């Protein structure tokens, strides 16, 4: 006798909710070169991406463009999950490609995994994409309690151990095609089994594939341990699991649908066309549909109101909002009501405070990298070996909280190789933490102003640092989606990576401009005295030319190896670095500025040209200062004739002479600002126009 076919109401309910609400947002590689719109690379990239869907479809779900030497070559890679139909694969590759181009404009390198049943990977770069184990980026996306299974502690423990055993089996089953799937029974769960697949990029070796999957197995402990449904991926591999079969990969292993809780053996049924359908099920399905629709409408209304309220706040404060990402890497946590707006508006990732606490060994003093007015910076390491720098806001500090919010809202959308990457943040009670990529060589001032370490900065390295900072500021001013003014450029806010390449850090004071906005005013003048231009100190007026002034001072410090504040009094007159260099120019002795640690083996014409550019940047009139795009051309094209600089701002006269600008300033309190991976011994000075 044929059994009545019953409907699992829980599965229907959660399927409707999930399919209506789960939307994945793209991610991009944090550091890459940038290209000009409609330029050679842009044209090649779009041509490559337009052909990628068909090539992936025609090559059994994986295709990598062959290497071609030469400039402006766009290399690409696409892969679809095993079991995806050819049409779904093609559509997925097309969708992800379009999303990446929209999300990462002018970015030469980007990568993203899609989500949903049609799981696929798209990656492109202006460099060779080789078959090495590339693990820089981690995705984790999952749906908690998709099937509404009750998780007691016993069940949760069983699920975790079963999941680990299943992943071990899957990894061991990986064959020459770099793919495997498996099923693991769950004795005490309504759904009885976990279904899982694992897959690697086909350009990996089998050994590297196994290593990549083993890392994912470990990653799961930090992001999604005990989660019933989800996927976790790195750049070269992914794992996916569910309590139901998916993609047609488990047809032979599918178990019977578990009985409905409403089926007690005596339910009323209606017979039609030879099929028995429970009357109670029909009523329940109708009720569930109404409830689901009501819930979704209420959620939509609530989200809409929250978004509008935040956008109003963002507009008033010069911030901007972006879409929320559901992907979460190591130790990240689901946003709660207190931080939901911050997470949704920044697109940044909220880390679990406990994960950061563990990574820094409970903020142990041996991991402390620096301390300032904002708080302390600690080195941390997650279980997978990823090193980070955690900036911890001092609990009683009122000064740091606005800067904290500003960095989360602003820096999360900035991606450039000469900017320090913000990985995420954590807010729990009074604890507020920013999590950055770890930069090993601390800040520029640790080398530049140290009598021993400064010898490591020869002229080619210093010139590379100047050029790298130029690229970073140019991105902020022109190439990012908004015009962003840093407002606190100085040696202690320039970090150096392992190859001594510069990365601009500390965006707590940064402001973004609206479209066509060229300048702004503020009643609260903040920054580091000596790097601030006269129009900002005196009138609170700032623009991109404010950063140009600070950059000019920084150029002169890099060449001279001396702080701007180290010039107190020369020959009876008050002085600073800018005044000192201007006098050297008038005396025809600019090379006297050069740091003796550089030695004699340097290009004198190149050094003089850089000093000249520095003086152009610190001119008193903002309109006379060159833009960062002009500065970049001056640095990289020696055929460009440099204009004659005008006298700089803050040109100090004899002590006996009055200084009109100084008389207009009312100095405020001075506090030290912290930054990623180093101690800033320069001070932040808050001054207000009198």
UniProtKB/Swiss-Prot annotation:
Keyword annotations: ATP-binding, Glycoprotein, Kinase, Membrane, Nucleotide-binding, Phosphoprotein, Receptor, Repeat, Serine/threonine-protein kinase, Signal, Transferase, Transmembrane, Transmembrane helix
Membrane topology classification: Single-pass membrane protein
Transmembrane stretches, start-end: 282-302
Signal peptide span: 1-24
Cytoplasmic membrane side: 303-690
Residues annotated as glycosylated: 130, 148, 155, 220, 268, 276
InterPro entries (UniProt xref): GNK2, GNK2_sf, Kinase-like_dom_sf, Prot_kinase_dom, Protein_kinase_ATP_BS, Ser/Thr_kinase_AS
Phosphothreonine PTM positions: 528
Name of protein: Cysteine-rich receptor-like protein kinase 21
Species per Swiss-Prot/TrEMBL record: Arabidopsis thaliana
């Amino acid at each position: 006798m044929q059994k009545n076919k019953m409907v699992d109401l829980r599965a229907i309910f959660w399927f409707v909710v999930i399919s209506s609400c789960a939307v994945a947002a793209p991610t991009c590689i944090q550091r890459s070169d940038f290209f000009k719109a409609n330029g050679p690379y842009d044209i090649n990239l779009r041509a490559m991406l337009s052909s990628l869907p068909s090539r992936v479809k025609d090559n059994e779900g994986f295709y990598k463009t062959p290497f071609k030497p030469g400039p402006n070559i766009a290399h690409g890679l696409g892969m679809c999950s095993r079991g995806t139909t050819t049409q779904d694969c093609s559509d997925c590759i097309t969708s992800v490609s379009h999303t990446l181009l929209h999300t990462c404009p002018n970015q030469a390198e980007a990568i993203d995994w899609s989500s949903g049943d049609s799981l696929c990977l798209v990656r492109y770069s202006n460099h060779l994409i080789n078959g090495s184990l590339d693990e820089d980026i981690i995705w984790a996306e999952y749906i908690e309690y998709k099937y509404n299974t009750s998780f007691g502690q016993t069940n949760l423990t069983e699920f975790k151990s079963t999941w680990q055993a299943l992943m071990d089996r899957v990894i061991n089953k990986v064959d020459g095609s770099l793919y495997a799937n498996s099923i693991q029974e769950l004795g005490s769960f309504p759904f009885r089994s976990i279904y899982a697949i694992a897959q690697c990029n086909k350009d990996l070796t089998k050994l590297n594939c196994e290593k990549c999957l083993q890392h994912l197995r470990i990653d799961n402990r930090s992001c999604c341990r005990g989660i019933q449904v989800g996927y976790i991926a790195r750049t070269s591999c992914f794992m996916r699991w569910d309590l139901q079969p998916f993609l047609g990969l488990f047809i032979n292993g599918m178990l019977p649908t578990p009985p409905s809780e409403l089926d007690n053996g005596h339910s009323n049924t209606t017979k039609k066309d030879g099929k028995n359908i429970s009357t109670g099920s029909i009523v329940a399905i109708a009720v569930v549909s109404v409830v689901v629709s009501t819930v979704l409408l209420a959620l939509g209304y609530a989200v809409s109101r929250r978004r509008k309220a935040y956008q109003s706040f963002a507009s008033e404060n010069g911030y901007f909002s972006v879409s929320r990402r559901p992907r979460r890497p190591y130790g990240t946590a689901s946003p709660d009501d207190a931080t939901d707006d911050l997470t949704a508006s920044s697109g940044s990732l909220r880390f679990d405070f406990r994960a950061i606490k563990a990574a820094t060994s409970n903020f142990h003093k041996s991991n402390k990298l620096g301390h300032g007015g904002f708080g302390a910076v600690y080195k941390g390491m997650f279980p997978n070996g990823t090193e980070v720098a955690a900036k911890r806001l001092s609990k009683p500090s009122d000064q740091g909280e606005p800067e904290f919010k500003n960095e989360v809202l602003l820096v999360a959308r900035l991606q450039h190789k000469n900017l320090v990457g913000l990985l995420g943040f954590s807010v729990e009670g009074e604890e507020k933490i920013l999590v950055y990529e770890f930069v090993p060589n601390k800040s520029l001032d640790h080398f530049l102003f140290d009598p021993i370490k400064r010898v490591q900065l020869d002229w080619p390295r210093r010139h590379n640092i100047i050029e790298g900072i130029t690229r970073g500021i140019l991105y902020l001013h022109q190439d990012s989606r908004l015009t962003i003014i840093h407002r606190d450029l100085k040696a202690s806010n320039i970090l150096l990576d392992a190859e001594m390449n510069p990365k601009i850090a500390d965006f707590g004071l940064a402001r973004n401009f609206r479209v066509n906005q060229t300048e702004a005013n503020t009643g609260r003048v903040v920054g580091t005295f000596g790097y601030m231009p006269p129009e900002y100190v005196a009138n609170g007026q700032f623009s991109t030319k404010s950063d140009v002034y600070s950059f000019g001072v920084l150029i002169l410090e890099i060449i001279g190896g001396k702080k701007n504040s180290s010039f107190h009094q020369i020959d009876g007159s008050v002085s600073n670095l800018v005044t000192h260099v201007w006098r050297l120019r008038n005396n025809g002795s600019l090379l006297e500025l050069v740091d003796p640690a550089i030695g004699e083996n340097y290009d004198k014409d190149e050094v003089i040209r850089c000093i000249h550019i520095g003086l152009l940047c610190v001119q008193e009139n903002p309109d006379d200062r060159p833009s960062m795009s002009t500065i970049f051309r001056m640095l990289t094209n020696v055929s460009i004739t440099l204009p004659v600089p005008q006298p700089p701002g803050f040109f100090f006269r004899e002590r006996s002479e009055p200084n009109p600008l100084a008389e207009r300033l009312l100095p405020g309190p001075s506090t030290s600002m912290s930054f990623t991976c180093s101690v800033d011994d320069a001070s932040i000075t808050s001054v207000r126009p009198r």
